Amino acid sequence: MRITQGTFSFLPELTDEQITKQLEYCLNQGWAVGLEYTDDPHPRNTYWEMFGLPMFDLRDAAGILMEINNARNTFPNHYIRVTAFDSTHTVESVVMSFIVNRPADEPGFRLVRQEEPGRTLRYSIESYAVQARPEGSRY
C-alpha cells in the first residue's frame, strides 16, 4: 500500500529532475529546506527525525539534492521527505513537504475497532510495519 502524505502524494514518484525544480521553487520563495526521515509513516506521526540541520543558508538546489542522495544512501529503507519552512511573520510554518524516498515494501495499515461502554465504537489505525517489528528494524 503506497503511503500518501505530502504535496505530491497522489502523483507518481518524482524524478531527481522534478525534485530539483521543486527545490528551486522553494528557494525562490525564500523558504528554508530541510530533510526528515522515519520508519513509522503513521499519519499522526508528524515528528520525523531530522537528517542534518535545516538548510537555512543553502541557496543551491543541486546542493540540497546531494543531501537528499546522502540521506537515501544512509537510510535506503526509510521514508525521506523534503520540508520547506516559511519564516515569514504570521506564517512561520512548513508550507510544503513531499516524500523523496520510500521502502521497497510498504505493508500499509490495518483498521482496529474497539468496543467501549455504551455501545460506543472507537476506531484507530496501526501500521503493519510497526506492529511486526520494533523501531529501527521495520524495513
Swiss-Prot record:
GO molecular function annotation: ribulose-bisphosphate carboxylase activity
Entry keyword annotation includes Membrane: no
Pfam families for this protein: RuBisCO_small
CDD domains: RuBisCO_small
Tree of life domain: Bacteria
Record's signal peptide: none
SMART domains: RuBisCO_small
Protein's GO biological process: reductive pentose-phosphate cycle
Keywords for the protein's UniProt record, in alphabetical order: Calvin cycle, Carbon dioxide fixation
Residue spans crossing the bilayer: none
Subunit: Heterohexadecamer of 8 large and 8 small subunits.
Family under the similarity heading: Belongs to the RuBisCO small chain family.
Reported function: RuBisCO catalyzes two reactions: the carboxylation of D-ribulose 1,5-bisphosphate, the primary event in carbon dioxide fixation, as well as the oxidative fragmentation of the pentose substrate. Both reactions occur simultaneously and in competition at the same active site. Although the small subunit is not catalytic it is essential for maximal activity.
Further facts: The basic functional RuBisCO is composed of a large chain homodimer in a 'head-to-tail' conformation. In form I RuBisCO this homodimer is arranged in a barrel-like tetramer with the small subunits forming a tetrameric 'cap' on each end of the 'barrel'.
Name under which the protein is recorded: Ribulose bisphosphate carboxylase small subunit, chromosomal
Gene (UniProt): cbbS
